[in-house]
Amino acid sequence: MAERVARLSSQRAVVIFGASNCFMCHVVKTLFSELGVSWAVHEVDKDPNGKDVERALAGMVGRTPPVPAVFIGGKLVGPTDQVMSLHLAGKLVPLLREAGALWLRDTKYSYILPANQLINYRSIN
């Protein structure tokens, strides 16, 4: 099951393993939405093998319940407290940018691109 978690966690720049009724999962999702993060979520309570996924995550995270478990760039960042610590220290956004997970809106042209692909057209003109 650890192999499945590793595979799922590397399919997108940011993957959140959570549960549909988990408040702290909602907190992380809200933070990422406000930061403009493109993320995927895997709700373990909706997965037929969710208990096995939770056991694998508990071994990786080192606690139970193991959700939310946040992966950025395929690497385990941790649960909510570690995500928030990174955010408060100013280290979360650079990590998200490096993983290609931040989406920014170009207000002049009204489209959305990943932050690492945003072209500054104002400097060209």
From Swiss-Prot:
Family matches, as CDD domains: GRX_GRXh_1_2_like (cd03419)
Domain of life: Eukaryota
SUPFAM superfamilies: Thioredoxin-like (SSF52833)
Ranges of residues in domain Glutaredoxin: 2-103
Keyword Transport: yes
Keywords in alphabetical order: Cytoplasm, Disulfide bond, Electron transport, Redox-active center, Transport
Disulphide bridges, residue numbers: 22-25
GO cellular component: cytoplasm
Compartments (UniProt record): Cytoplasm
One Pfam family matching this protein: Glutaredoxin
InterPro entries in alphabetical order: GlrX-like_pln_2, Glutaredoxin, Thioredoxin-like_sf
NCBIfam families according to UniProt: GlrX-like_plant
Protein role: Has a glutathione-disulfide oxidoreductase activity in the presence of NADPH and glutathione reductase. Reduces low molecular weight disulfides and proteins.
Family: Belongs to the glutaredoxin family. CC-type subfamily.
Entry protein name: Putative glutaredoxin-C2
Species of provenance: Oryza sativa subsp. japonica
Origin organism lineage: Eukaryota, Viridiplantae, Streptophyta, Embryophyta, Tracheophyta
